[in-house]
């Protein structure tokens, strides 16, 4: 895997600036240069020894493009990887980057829009490489961190990477940055990409990989001066979309009386949709394999829907909530199902991206989410409930 690299000549990214000063110019000091070079190269060799045994998941579509992506990472400083939900790009790209020789002179930083995704994806990658979380694969979110500077891959929220820029403006801890779900275009993501565009001029050794849904890739490519785009296919089966009858209510926003009416009718509509899904599963001959993922706007709404479904929904069905503040034990029930029988997962938009909830056959989408918005007038960050975008709707559709 590392045959294209001369490991003897590699040094840690954080040491390269000091080595440049010691190697030439008025601060040149051959003795100190040699000492620092040998010390830094020893760290690189230690990282080579710590590289995990990587076996890509052959069931995921992205692995078909692994050789092409490895060559692209080695050749270009910035690449864009476009793929639909279910392609496996979130869990496989860090491993493909390691196969391309990245992670030796610094960590592979992999950003996620949400804390839940950062934790669950890091756990999944650690399992795939056969290690405990916190060894070569770690994560860092607010108030929680596993791993160290010696880790090869670090999952984190985009907010954590932004915070690190305040005290490490050259991102010397990293030799590769992966920006996942860039199409979400949050303030953090946009700021990071703007910063990276300037940083790559000063750090030619830094590689940047941007992943996105297929809608915005040309815009990202143009922004990074024609960076190559690699499209990865998603699911290999069609998804049937059924629409509930159109309501006469004109939904405008969470402050609207009409939206309140919509919220009152939502539990009833969800129960009807669940019954329709289970009926469809019975007609198609797989009644025991009909897990449902329901997208809801808020944690409170999830609790209300859970209570309604427990009272009025189908029997012998496990109903589980999924939101950002959920404990690790509760998350494990969702991502590692152990029991038999049907499940209904009620989630906020944390389930839109990154790790796919297993065994989902049906998705019920309310079409709304609580979305972070910055108010220029009041100068505060708000979380209004809004209708989701077409890109988000496609992401949700792809969860089954």
Task: Give names to the regions the model predicted.
Residues 1-400:
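P-loop NTPase motor module signature
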């Amino acid at each position: 895997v590392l045959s294209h690299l001369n490991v003897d000549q590699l040094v840690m990214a954080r040491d390269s600036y000091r080595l440049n000063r010691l190697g030439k110019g008025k601060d040149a000091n051959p003795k100190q240069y040699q000492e620092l070079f040998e010390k830094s190269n020893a760290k690189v060799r230690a990282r080579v020894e710590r590289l995990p045994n990587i076996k890509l998941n052959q069931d995921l579509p992205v692995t078909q493009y692994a050789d092409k992506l490895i060559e692209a990472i080695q050749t270009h400083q910035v690449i864009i990887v476009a793929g639909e939900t279910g392609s496996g790009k979130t869990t496989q790209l860090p491993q493909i980057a390691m196969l391309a020789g990245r992670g030796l002179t610094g960590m592979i930083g992999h950003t996620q829009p949400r804390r839940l995704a950062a934790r669950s994806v890091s756990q999944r990658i650690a399992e795939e490489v056969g290690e405990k979380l916190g060894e070569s694969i770690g994560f860092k979110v607010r108030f929680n961190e596993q791993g160290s500077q010696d880790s090869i891959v670090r999952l984190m929220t985009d907010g954590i990477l932004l915070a690190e820029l305040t005290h490490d403006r050259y991102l010397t801890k990293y030799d590769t940055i992966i920006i996942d779900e860039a199409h979400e275009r949050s303030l953090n993501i946009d700021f990071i990409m703007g910063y990276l565009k300037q940083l790559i001029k000063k750090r030619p050794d830094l590689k940047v990989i941007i992943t996105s849904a297929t809608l915005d890739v040309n815009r990202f490519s143009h922004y990074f001066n024609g960076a190559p785009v690699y499209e990865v296919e998603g699911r290999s089966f069609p998804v049937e979309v059924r629409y509930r009858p159109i309501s006469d209510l004109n939904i405008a926003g969470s402050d609207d009386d009409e939206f309140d009416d919509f919220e009152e009718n939502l539990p009833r509509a969800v129960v009807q949709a669940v019954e329709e899904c289970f009926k469809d599963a019975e007609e198609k001959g797989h009644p025991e394999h009909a897990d449902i993922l329901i997208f809801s706007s808020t944690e409170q709404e999830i609790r209300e829907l859970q209570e309604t479904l427990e009272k009025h929904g189908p029997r012998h069905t496990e109903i589980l909530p999924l939101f950002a503040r959920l404990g690790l034990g509760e998350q494990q029930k969702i991502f590692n199902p152990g029991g038999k029988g049907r499940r209904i997962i009620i989630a906020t938009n944390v389930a839109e991206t990154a790790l796919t909830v297993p065994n989902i056959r049906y998705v019920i989408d309310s079409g709304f989410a609580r979305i972070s918005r910055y108010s220029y007038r009041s100068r505060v960050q708000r979380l209004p409930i809004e209708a989701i975008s077409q890109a988000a709707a496609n992401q949700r559709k792809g969860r089954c």
